[in-house]
Amino acid sequence: MLNQQPRLRRIAWMGSSFDDLRQFPEDVRRDAGFQLYRLQSGLEAADWKAMPQLGRGVEEIRLRHFSGAYRVIYLARFAEAIYVLHCFNKKTRRTAEHEKQIVRSRLRVIQQEHRSQK
């Protein structure tokens, strides 16, 4: 039997999310990349949480580091891609309203694109 690689879903980086991720410490970036690879392969991230208050299908990958908590917010409900909506360093127990607004505005762009394709 041939050992086949899984077909990976495309990652679509919204806004500045890729540049924001690149600002994370190296080991956090590496862990985020591995967790995104798991999503691309059809698996769940190791530590994730649904974020229904931000939109249907929005989820976050939770990354911990001695320098703080980091988040990768994504949408994986569409077959063509995993949309990375936002990446940020979480500084308080609750997600800041500013971070939520960024996610909502980028999610609206995706929703409008999907409506126009129907």
Tell me what each language-model feature is.
Residues 75:
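Catalytic DNA-binding helix-loop module of base-excision-repair DNA glycosylases/AP lyases
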Residues 85:
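Conserved catalytic cores of phosphodiester-cleaving nucleases, focusing on short active-site segments
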Residues 72:
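Portal/gating segments that form or line small-molecule/metal binding sites
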Residues 1-69, 78-81, 89-118:
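Basic, Lys/Arg-enriched alpha-helical interface segments
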